[in-house]
Amino acid sequence: MNKPTPAIVSQDAARRLPRWALLLFCLAYAVPGLVGRAPWKSADLASFGYMLEMARGQTSWMDPRLLGLRPEADGLLPYWLGAAAIRLGDGWLAPAMAARLPFFVLLGLAMAATWYAVYLLARKPQAQPVAFAFGGEARPSDYARAIADGGLLALIACLGLAQLAHEITTSVAQLAFTALAFYGAAGIGRRRWWPEIGLLLGLAGLALSGAPTISAFLGAGAAVLHVLATARPWRKGDWRVLGIIALATLLAILLSSSMDLWRWRILLPQDAGSKDWRTILRLLVWFTWPAWPLVMWSLWRWRLQVWSRTPSLHVALPLWFMLVTLVAALTTKPADRALLLALPAMATVAAFALPTLTRSVAALIDWFTLLFFTGCGAIIWIIWIAMQTGYPRQGASNVQRQAPDFVASFSLPVFLVALVATLVWGWLVHWRVGRHRAAIWKSMVLPAGGAALCWLLLMSLWMPLLDYVRSYSVVVRNVMAIAHPAQCIQQWGLSREQVAAFAYHGGYRISQATPDQLECPWLVVNPEALAGLQVQASAGQWQLLATLRRPSDKGDDVMLLRRTSP
């Protein structure tokens, strides 16, 4: 027996967001950060370094290494995608741009899979709104489409999605395959086979992207929930659903075993002190904003469906995906990259809060969003004006302090793009307060629009500054002014991203220094490893020419030494 639904939605409220508007939302969010920037510290640049080495044939595709160092993240599939794109784009695309293209597709896949997952869950009978006595309630397909629109907007609105989703790391691949597996689990058992294919590819891709344990738990939990959610779970059709989920999960486990992907990364209780729980709490609050307040509201309003003997999949399934990834964030490092995988499920649960919101709560969301993102956009513009003109003086001095040698430049196309985006934000605010008050996705328009606006402004107006402070290009250029890339140069103690930066920005073919092999006239050293070098080699053989520092990081120095004696 279905529990009473808290959703009361008229047909007028189930109007869909125009497809062109939804597509523009997605493009305005996904494209900025794709073009016009260098690889950034640290995971983004390190991953790119491995992809570049693989594409150039300098390392094995099955065991990639940078000067003998394996990637910190397990799972080779993202590296294969990036390296293949670099090789295919050789001669007509810059390597950094080519490497980003498959990850741009993966971000689009995550968005599309989330929309379809919400749509399929909203089509389930337990998720449907109350039927009116004299008709006029929302039609199932229209209601599901409106809820899916709200779910996708909620995903775009999440603050934590912006930077991590625009990197070329395993995290983006894990996000896409988690969303794909979520879509498959939500729609499995329908007449078409697309959800089954999505589940197989999602769980397998998630395992091959370095998250085999999460993949196994998601698959096993989805199977259990499908059994619990069925009144008569042992019918022929339900056996088929259970078998497909079990097969997909088993395939992911076998792939993980064959690729030797199982690693113990759980922090045991005695290691709990290594995690700053206050930092984790702050991360949860801002990273998942504005989804988490809506998730709490949704779980309360749909509590009867959650705690029923036969739980409703439209809430229970995303709740399971959310719990698995939240536990991973709390028990592994880094927490933000594991928490990224929770966002599609959180956006789904948040979407089911939309038809239950009161006017006062919806108004609170709108006003807070309006003030927050308008303020953020204004700050971005003010700092940009300060970079261009020197006024306001406080803003200009802050930039000068963070990036002492940065010289701002004016670009008319960039200015026009930022101006148009700001005007569109003003139009969205006018639209929201003036019309279409009935649409159930209306409360997510300003959060998603504000997130897209601020990300676009950062990736346009602030891009030169961000490139200056977040890439290693300045350090490499300073080294190139002293040591030509064609000369023999070795390194001691450099990180993965630093080695990748020298290869990409300077074209250096750096070799690893060893205690009995300090044969090059030039040596690049991490200051923290200098003591070890002095033990292994005679310090009198080397002259320190320069200590070079990234502008925004006092603890990220590189020392350039030249041999003074044979």
Q: Model regions: which residues?
A:
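Extracytosolic helix-loop segments that constitute the early lumenal/periplasmic catalytic or substrate-binding loops
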Residues: 47-73, 77, 84-87
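Short acidic/glycine- and proline-prone juxtamembrane loop motifs at membrane-interface regions
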Residues: 160-173, 212-214
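Loop-to-helix entry region of an early transmembrane alpha helix in multi-pass inner-membrane enzymes
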Residues: 76, 80, 89-117, 141-149, ...
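Membrane-embedded architecture of ER/inner-membrane glycosylation machinery
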Residues: 3-23, 171, 187-566
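Intrinsically disordered, low-complexity acidic Ser/Thr-rich regulatory segments
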Residues: 135-154, 462
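Transmembrane-helix motifs of polytopic, lipid-linked glycan transferases
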Residues: 101-139, 156-157, 180
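Aromatic-rich transmembrane-lumenal/periplasmic boundary elements in polytopic membrane proteins
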Residues: 27-61, 262-271
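Hydrophobic/aromatic residues in alpha-helical transmembrane segments
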Residues: 114-117, 161, 181, 295, ...
